[in-house]
């Protein structure tokens, strides 16, 4: 129970961290790409 609980917590933490990181990375990448090509969302 303790191990599975810890793994579940780690999975949720990693999922949230990856989601936020990917969102921020994509936002920054797309924003930079849009600016470099003069594209507005």
Swiss-Prot record:
The keyword Repeat applies. Residues 9-32 are annotated as: 7 X 4 AA tandem repeats of W-M-D-G. Keywords: Repeat. Sequence repeats lie at residues 9-12, 13-16, 17-20, 21-24, 25-28, 29-32. This is Uncharacterized protein C03B1.10. It comes from Caenorhabditis elegans.
